[in-house]
């Protein structure tokens, strides 16, 4: 009887896990539009712009039982293909490069976080925090 209960519990948890991973609360890794901010200490304003970034859910595993094995690497939603675009900050003094370049996500995938090209730190409390006055809204896709 205990074996049957254990099997039933395993089956229910398996089905629930599959159902939860496909639900609307966890959109899978994909390009989305996001508004970011750019500034330069030598220029008088901060400017916001809209671009595409990679965001969404990546399936992952965590070891439940302690083991002598190293932890399982956790995949993150990151760029598969990208291009770069640039904006010019207005009002920069002569001799200061007003150009700010940024990545534009063309496609995304779940994979290891590469610190050389990605910020792997998770969500920010203030993603649009600027030290300079804010000049709103450019759209670059």
UniProtKB/Swiss-Prot annotation:
Residue numbers of Blocked amino end (Ser) PTMs: 21
Residues annotated as glycosylated: 33
Keyword Disulfide bond: yes
Compartment(s): Secreted
GO terms of molecular function: hormone activity
Signal peptide coordinates: 1-20
GO biological process terms on file: G protein-coupled receptor signaling pathway
Keywords associated with the record: Disulfide bond, Glycoprotein, Hormone, Secreted, Signal
One annotated Gene Ontology cellular component of this protein: cytoplasm
PANTHER family referenced in this protein's UniProt entry, alphabetically: GLYCOPROTEIN HORMONE BETA CHAIN (PTHR11515), LUTROPIN SUBUNIT BETA (PTHR11515:SF11)
Assigned protein family: Belongs to the glycoprotein hormones subunit beta family.
Purpose of the protein: Promotes spermatogenesis and ovulation by stimulating the testes and ovaries to synthesize steroids.
Protein name as it appears in the record: Lutropin subunit beta
Organism name: Sus scrofa (Pig)
Gene: LHB
């Amino acid at each position: 009887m205990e074996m049957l209960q254990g099997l039933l519990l395993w089956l229910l948890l398996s089905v629930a896990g599959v159902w939860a991973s496909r639900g609307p609360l966890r959109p899978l890794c994909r390009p989305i539009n996001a508004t970011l901010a750019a500034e330069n200490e030598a220029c008088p304003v901060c400017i916001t712009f809209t671009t595409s970034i990679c965001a969404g859910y990546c399936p992952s595993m965590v070891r439940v039982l302690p083991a002598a094995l190293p932890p399982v690497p956790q995949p993150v939603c990151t760029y598969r293909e990208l291009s770069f675009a640039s904006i010019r900050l207005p009002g920069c003094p002569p001799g200061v490069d007003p150009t700010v370049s940024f990545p534009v996500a063309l496609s995304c995938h779940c994979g290891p976080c590469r610190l050389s090209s990605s910020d792997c730190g998770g969500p920010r409390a203030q993603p649009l925090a600027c030290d300079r006055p804010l000049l709103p809204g450019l759209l670059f896709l």
